[in-house]
Amino acid sequence: LIFHEKMSGATKGYALIRLNFKSHIFEIRRIAITDKGRGYGKESMKGLIRYAFEKTDTNRLWLDVYPDNEIGIKLYESLGMHCDGVLRQNYLAERGYLDQIIYSILRSEYAEGKYTD
């Protein structure tokens, strides 16, 4: 998915998603925003969450984030996402093994208003 600014139509980022139709799981594999600190990331995440629960049969939306991505973690928590746990040393990068934190939100939480728009 490509994110565009409403007024200018300029591309501001993208997301790679995977939707498992059998288990109704919506995974955000990657989200990248070009102009950081301007609210595009938050608006993009809000749009993805709304899309997942209002336009598809999604029961659970989830993503993973590295512990050093403090801005991302604050964003996901501000949107009502729940920390499911940590996959310790789950990814081998140039700088060594990295943990991955799993965040998710369920359809029931979205419907109850636990999602913060």
Where are these regions (language model features)?
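Conserved acetyl-CoA-binding loop-helix of GNAT-fold acetyltransferases
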Residues: I33, R38-A52, I73-S78
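Short glycine/proline-centered loop/turn elements that form peptide/ligand docking sites
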Residues: G41, M45, D68-G72, Q89-E94
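Acetyl-CoA-dependent GNAT
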Residues: L1-K36, Y51, K55-T56, L106-Y110
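Conserved active-site tyrosine of GNAT-family acetyltransferases
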Residues: Y76, M81, Y103
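Conserved catalytic-core motifs of GNAT/GCN5-like acyltransferases
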Residues: W62-D64, H82-D99
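Terminal substrate-recognition subdomain of acyl/acetyltransferases
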Residues: G96-D117
